[in-house]
């Protein structure tokens, strides 16, 4: 089965390209184009009253669709922002900066978190414990040891590590070791929409952060976070959306917050991407496209891709260079580690000249897979690497 008919607008712009970087910027399906225009039309109709439509109709619909996708029992606990950093920093701003802050994380987190935490470490009262991702085979054991060695105020870990594609131990397997007073944030950006994910058993205990840019296929500008129900946390970094329902009432000296996920909301943003995300999720629902089906399709593509790699017998790009050769516990991109960053850059440029788009970081070359690929597409690698 091919899904290419759903991505014609993007594919027609790149007829001679094999786009192997959907893990960076995923092609948008055709349904998102009408959604983009729908936001414009709603703005024209509603003008200043469009917020009533967005908060009263559009946003609740997307909350319900996300709750279905992630098996979350409380749709109202999803909050939206333009980027994950904004949501992450709202959680961090709940901690008193005058008090010590102890953070547990890995050394494989994306820049939104890793850069911010390095900056926080410049404070004398912030301590960060980083568990090395490698060797990946023992990460789960070492992570659990770190959890048991001391208590933390904040724990942050990816669902899938961005620089390898390796699936991290699911939070449900180690949450029992975490005290109730510790806040837990899971970065689901490389898991949401790619790996079957159920938040049902952890929804009231963790923050789950993800966005539409990658496997949710709706582009930049719409990130979201599930917030534990009943949390009393009060983000210092807050905006007028965080108590939207009470804006017309007299403002009190004491800052009030919504009693659902919106307590972590910010302020005015462009909701065009929310419309696109709704279109994608509605398309999946109507066509019966589940994340499990997407994952199975991509796993088969990865096997087909590796079969071509084996045929090539390339001196650098081969199965031995795979960072981890385990498709069962892997995200939707494969990572090859070469001897040097210079060789990676040169190989990426050669592939690009041959019509194969990849991306790379240092010594690691990444190939991503998507619904708009067919197994036959990977034959292009032979020409690109000849």
Please place each PLM-identified region on the residue numbering.
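Pyridoxal 5′-phosphate
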Residues: 1-386
């Amino acid at each position: 089965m091919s899904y290419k008919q759903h991505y014609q607008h993007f594919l027609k712009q790149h007829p001679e390209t094999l786009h192997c970087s959907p893990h960076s910027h995923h092609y948008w399906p055709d349904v998102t184009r009408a959604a983009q225009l729908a936001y414009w039309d709603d703005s024209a109709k509603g003008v200043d009253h469009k917020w009533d439509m967005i908060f009263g109709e559009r946003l609740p619909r997307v909350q319900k669709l996300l709750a279905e996708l992630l098996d979350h029992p409380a749709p109202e606990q999803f909050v939206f922002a333009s980027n994950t950093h904004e949501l992450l920093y709202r959680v961090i701003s709940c901690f008193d900066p005058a008090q010590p802050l102890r953070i547990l994380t890995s050394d494989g987190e994306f820049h939104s978190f890793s850069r911010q935490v390095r900056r926080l470490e410049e404070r004398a009262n912030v301590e960060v414990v980083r568990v090395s991702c490698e060797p990946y085979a023992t990460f789960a054991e070492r992570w659990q040891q770190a959890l048991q060695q001391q208590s933390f105020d904040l724990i942050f870990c990816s669902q899938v590590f961005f620089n390898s594609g390796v699936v991290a131990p699911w939070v449900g397997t180690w949450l029992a070791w975490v005290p109730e007073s510790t806040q837990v944030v899971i970065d689901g950006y490389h898991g949401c929409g790619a790996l079957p994910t159920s938040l049902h058993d952890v929804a009231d205990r963790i923050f789950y952060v993800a966005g539409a840019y990658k496997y949710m296929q709706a582009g930049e500008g719409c990130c979201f976070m599930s917030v534990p129900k009943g949390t009393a946390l009060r983000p210092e970094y807050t905006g007028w959306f965080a108590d939207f329902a009470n804006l017309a009432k007299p403002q009190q000296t004491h800052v009030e917050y919504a009693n659902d996920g919106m307590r972590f909301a910010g302020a005015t943003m462009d909701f065009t991407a929310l419309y696109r995300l709704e279109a994608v999720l509605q398309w999946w629902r109507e066509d019966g496209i589940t994340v499990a089906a997407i994952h199975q399709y991509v796993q088969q593509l990865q096997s087909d891709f590796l079969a071509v790699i084996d045929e090539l017998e390339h001196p650098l790009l081969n199965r031995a260079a795979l960072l981890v050769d385990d498709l069962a516990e892997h995200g939707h991109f494969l990572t090859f580690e070469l001897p040097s960053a210079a060789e990676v850059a040169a190989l990426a440029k050669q592939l690009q000249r041959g019509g194969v788009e990849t991306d790379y970081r240092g010594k690691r070359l990444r190939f991503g897979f998507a619904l708009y690929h067919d197994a036959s597409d990977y034959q292009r690698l032979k020409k690109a690497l000849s």
